[in-house]
From Swiss-Prot:
Pathway this chain belongs to: Quinol/quinone metabolism; 1,4-dihydroxy-2-naphthoate biosynthesis; 1,4-dihydroxy-2-naphthoate from chorismate: step 2/7; Quinol/quinone metabolism; menaquinone biosynthesis
Protein name: 2-succinyl-5-enolpyruvyl-6-hydroxy-3-cyclohexene-1-carboxylate synthase
Source organism phylogeny: Bacteria, Pseudomonadati, Pseudomonadota, Gammaproteobacteria, Enterobacterales
Keywords of the record: Magnesium, Manganese, Menaquinone biosynthesis, Metal-binding, Thiamine pyrophosphate, Transferase
UniProt xrefs under HAMAP family: MenD
Function of the molecule: Catalyzes the thiamine diphosphate-dependent decarboxylation of 2-oxoglutarate and the subsequent addition of the resulting succinic semialdehyde-thiamine pyrophosphate anion to isochorismate to yield 2-succinyl-5-enolpyruvyl-6-hydroxy-3-cyclohexene-1-carboxylate (SEPHCHC).
Known EC number: 2.2.1.9
Entry note: cofactor: Binds 1 thiamine pyrophosphate per subunit.
Domain of life: Bacteria
Length: 556
């Protein structure tokens, strides 16, 4: 009996089972113990293969692919700490709903806890973060293939969001020519190999039913809060709120066009919060809200009913309102709960939103990161998409910009870490094939610097803007102790990115003014390559501009 041949047949069943659940993209890191999985993936023509040498970046690449494709994405890694490097992407997927299938190769049981090389306790290592965890046995013909395929089907058939961890131990030898070992074992699955359906089909999840009293509530004074959603959903939500005559507070990831822009500014005005107190119902569509003032208002508002509609399960309400947690696709929910044409009931808020935007426009000429955040809508590629990093940059765009309705925007706003952002952006571009503008801070770029290797392979123009404010300037917005702020919070690195771009043979520019930036962008959108643009700004200008605008708008 050939152990290596049967390892590959076992792995082939696993990989083929994945295809029945929509897996097309598969991300592979180098490794020896994962050889059966890697070769099975390579031989399966249903897959689009992606490779990367860094497992942490590989996990985030898969996350970006899943964000756009809306399908599960598989990841193959070898044993040991390679597995642990997938943790950040798995955590993010669990919070934002992307489906990741983590296939982690492992040593067989007799090599665990005995000093064997690259052997750690992998089963259960991700704790509660995967939606499902499967610890497979060592491949053996004593276990029927139908058990293996139905085990995979059960986990994937009931997966609605988050990750599945499938731990796959393989004994040596891992290499060798294929022979007939296990062929009859594999063939007992019959015509399943020619079919395209799962061996075991699970019943679909039950979503929240239509709210029978919606016809009552839609006649009341309501507020719509729009969080993370798809571009198509964003357009529908904007029209729905407009028809109802309810004010729409749109997050940067809502893609609603933010009809009342600069919400994080005008929500700091007492006139706005006073008017919002008249709301009898708040309907929040989508989660992962960004703006600090929006979160403060959300925590303090007390409508008669607070509804949260999102496809992701869980409470999603840190303020613990009395109301309804409705699990549903947003577009489907809107169709079940049609709007009725009514006149807008808010008077002050539209005026404040207009005045807040005018205040932002008045200071747009200076070359700085706050001004870039405001101008970002002018720099979006046609028929493209935007990827926004975390920390200060996403807050500035949320507060100061007005993105077009229905324009795709992506970000990692679940756990909101600065790790893996470039890798995620690479996955977003690969899955969509669209021109992509990505914007991150300097520490975020440093954190995922080796992901520049992924940006060498793009199918359409990709522009990476690194806003270099020399450290974590978001801490300038927080009451961190001034005496220790620079050493323990900001951590300035005093670096530039020209040589990093050169190492990966990427085009690099460092514009000094808006005209130079616009010239570079116009050229970048013409060729399907990556362009790194480093925008060096004064350290604290972005945070100070935001604080000044908050103070100004609060007194309107």
């Amino acid at each position: 009996m050939s152990v290596s041949a049967f390892n590959r047949r076992w792995a082939a069943v696993i990989l083929e089972a994945l295809t029945r659940h929509g897996v097309r993209h598969i991300c592979i890191a180098p490794g020896s113990r994962s050889t059966p999985l890697t070769l099975a993936a390579a031989e399966n023509s249903a897959f689009i293969h992606h490779t990367h040498f860094d497992e942490r970046g590989l996990g985030h690449l898969a996350l970006g692919l899943a964000k756009v494709s809306k399908q599960p994405v598989a990841v193959i890694v070898t044993s040991g700490t390679a597995v642990a490097n997938l943790y950040p992407a798995l955590i993010e997927a669990g919070l934002t709903g992307e489906k990741l299938i983590l296939l982690t190769a492992d040593r067989p049981p007799e090599l665990i806890d005995c000093g064997a090389n690259q052997a750690i306790r992998q089963p259960g290592m991700f704790a509660s973060h995967p939606t499902h965890s499967i610890s497979l046995p060592r491949p053996t013909q004593d276990i029927p293939a139908r058990w293996l395929v139905s085990t995979i089907d059960h986990a994937l058939g009931t997966l609605h969001a988050g990750g599945v961890h499938i731990n796959c131990p393989f004994a040596e030898p891992l290499y060798g020519e294929m022979d007939d070992t296990g062929l009859s074992w594999q063939q007992r699955l019959g015509d399943w190999w020619q079919d395209d359906k799962p061996w075991l089909r699970e019943a679909p999840r039950l979503e929240s039913e239509k709210q029978r009293d919606w016809f009552f509530w839609r006649q009341k004074r309501g507020v719509v809060v729009a969080g993370r959603m798809s571009a198509e959903e964003g357009k529908k939500v904007a029209l729905w709120a407009q028809t109802l005559g309810w004010p729409l507070i749109g997050d940067v990831l809502s893609q609603t066009g933010q009809p009342l822009p600069c919400a994080d500014l005008w929500l700091g005005n007492a006139k706005a919060t006073s008017e919002l107190q008249q709301a009898q119902i708040v309907v929040q569509l989508g989660s992962s809200l960004t703006g600090k003032r929006l979160l403060q208002w959300q925590a303090s508002c007390e409508p008669e009913e607070y509804w949260i509609v999102d496809d992701i399960e869980g409470r999603l309400d840190p303020a613990h309102h009395r109301g309804r947690r409705l699990i549903a696709n947003i577009a489907d929910w809107l169709e079940l709960h049609p709007a009725e044409k009514r006149q807008p009931w808010c008077v002050e808020i539209p005026r404040l939103a207009e005045q807040a935007m005018q205040a932002v426009i008045a200071c747009r000429d200076a070359f700085g990161e706050a001004q870039l955040a405001h101008r970002i809508s002018d720099y979006l590629p046609e028929q493209g998409q935007l990827f926004v990093g975390n920390s200060l940059v996403v807050r500035l765009i949320d507060a100061l910009s007005q993105l077009p309705a229905g324009y795709p925007v992506y970000s990692n706003r679940g756990a909101s870490g600065i790790d893996g952002l470039l890798s995620t952006a690479a996955g977003v571009q690969r899955a969509s094939g669209k021109p992509t503008l990505a914007i991150v801070g300097d520490l975020s770029a440093l954190y995922d610097l080796n992901a520049l290797a992924l940006l060498r392979q793009v199918s359409a123009p990709l522009v990476l803007i690194v806003v270099n404010n020399n450290g974590g300037q978001i801490f300038s917005l927080l009451p961190t102790p001034k005496s220790e702020r620079e050493r323990f919070y900001l951590m300035p690195q005093n670096v530039h990115f020209e040589h990093a771009a050169a190492m990966f043979e990427l085009k690099y520019h460092r514009p000094q003014n808006w005209q130079e930036l616009e010239t570079v962008l116009a050229d970048a959108w013409r060729t399907p390559t990556t362009t790194v643009i480093e925008m060096v700004v004064n350290d604290t200008d972005g945070a100070q501009t935001l604080q000044q605008l908050l103070a100004q708008v609060s007194h309107l």
